[in-house]
Amino acid sequence: MTDIAAPPAPGTSPVRVRFCPSPTGTPHVGLIRTALFNWAHARHTGGTFVFRIEDTDAARDSEESYAQILDALDWLGLDWDEGIGVGGPHEPYRQSLRRPVYDDVVRRLREAGHLYESFSTAEEIEARHEAAGRPKVLGYDGFDRDLTPEQVAAFRAEGREPTLRLRLPEGRDYSFDDVVRGRIEFKAGSFPDPVLVRANGDPLYTLVNPVDDALMGITHVLRGEDLLSSTPRQIALHEALVDIGVSQAVPLFGHLPYVTGEGSKKLSKRDPESNLFHHRDRGFIREGLLNYLALLGWGISEDRDVFSVEEMVAAFDVADVNASPARFDVAKAEAINAAHLRLLAPEDFRGRLVPYLQAAGVLPAQPSPEQLERLAAAAPLVQERMTLLGQAPGMLGFLFVADGDVVLEPDATAALRPEAADVLDASLAALEALTGWTTADLEAALRAAVVEGLGVKPKFAFAPLRTAVTGRRVSPPLFESMEILGRESSLARLRRLRATL
């Protein structure tokens, strides 16, 4: 027998919330939004954030997915006070290791009359509905609630093994105050007695999730809207757990809004935007993504979208979460991320560019001091222009390649105007005679040679130089880039393009 200590009742102790994902697939932004809101509620109230894993589905669970969940939480800085890797008074925190606990609770529920054996097959249930003229969608009909010993013996003689169902009170309406949605009511008969244990003895999610919440003293169950319909069954089980002394009270429930994609459809795992790591790979920083995920159902004020995670924690109240579906707007997410990039200290921003430049092959695994010095000079040129760190290779790659290897992008060369050759000739003449090579020196000399000397409008004057130096139509500021490249590289690139015209 497992010794189970009753936890404190909700409202009589500090807040205890949990994040309990199943390790199936890559982390979904909706899942991580749920983790964020639970974490923020715990941090705001001075409560406890518990992290456990619901890994009882051997056919779908994977260690790879488990590792990805840990990676996601670690990257975002969503730390937990109790659970996986941290420990605590309710170990273990993986459901697959808690079978003795569930078996003991099942035994106690059976002894108290809250569970009963159910032998009915799906086909038999459907046949009874059809014979009675009832809709088949009603599901289980309660046939096994009061079987006689003779009926049970007959079923067992046929070799049948029963499932175990929770005996719901007859004629009972279930209502509760959802901390997000307000008063919600489920009428009696709108849901059947749920199966809690399979015929082979394996406990189902419908049992283990509420049991863990009860034993771990969870005071607030904050979860996705898709689980709202299961709440009355869970409340009924929690009441049974109170009756047998496993729990002291039913936790409070709050159901967070769906995260939708284009067309207001629920964001599917098949949608790229649903994959948390897709956004990290594109160059979202944790501050920007956390800020945007917070906006999927909550806001710090009506006139302010950009805030730090510390400001979120200080202001977060789960009662302020909006129940309406929240659309994942990629453009808005990128704008939020851009704002956070601009808020980074220069050295922090520079450091975050390095992995993206390395992944693209722009920088080696061990950049040289010269490369790091060049990056330090160039990073401020793009910090105000960048929305995603993944743009770094395209914006800065030209600074880290040999002069002859600069890729002249087709759209850039195609946009060159007829006077491009004259512009390059005049620029080369002016620059070759230049003694200084500062941004100010370069701008003064080139404006005098091209804008004043050739009469080319400033709008078009420097496009050939930009293409020659960077290979692109759009780049970091030209004169600053040429200063960083230095005299020899800049002149070599101008001559290279001129030779093609």
Swiss-Prot record:
Q: Which GO terms describe its molecular function?
A: ATP binding; glutamate-tRNA ligase activity; tRNA binding; zinc ion binding
Membrane-crossing segments per the record: none
- The positions annotated for binding ATP are K269
Q: Where in the cell is it found?
A: Cytoplasm
Cellular-component GO terms for this entry: cytosol
Q: Would the keyword Hydrolase turn up in this protein's UniProt record?
A: no
EC numbers on record: 6.1.1.17
Q: Which residue ranges does the UniProt annotation give for the motif 'KMSKS' region?
A: 266-270
Provide this UniProt record's keywords sorted from A to Z: Aminoacyl-tRNA synthetase, ATP-binding, Cytoplasm, Ligase, Nucleotide-binding, Protein biosynthesis
Gene Ontology BP terms:
glutamyl-tRNA aminoacylation
What EC class does the entry list?
A: ligase
Q: Where is this motif: 'HIGH' region?
A: 21-31
Query: Has the keyword Protein biosynthesis been applied to this entry?
Result: yes
Q: Which domain of life is it from?
A: Bacteria
Q: Pfam families from the entry?
A: Anticodon_2, tRNA-synt_1c
This enzyme catalyses: tRNA(Glu) + L-glutamate + ATP = L-glutamyl-tRNA(Glu) + AMP + diphosphate
Q: Which family does it belong to?
A: Belongs to the class-I aminoacyl-tRNA synthetase family. Glutamate--tRNA ligase type 1 subfamily.
Which NCBIfam families does the record cross-reference, listed alphabetically? Answer: gltX_bact (TIGR00464)
**Subunit details:** Monomer.
According to its UniProt entry, what is the function of this protein?
Answer: Catalyzes the attachment of glutamate to tRNA(Glu) in a two-step reaction: glutamate is first activated by ATP to form Glu-AMP and then transferred to the acceptor end of tRNA(Glu).
The protein in question is named Glutamate--tRNA ligase
User: What organism does the UniProt record list as the source?
Assistant: Kineococcus radiotolerans (strain ATCC BAA-149 / DSM 14245 / SRS30216)
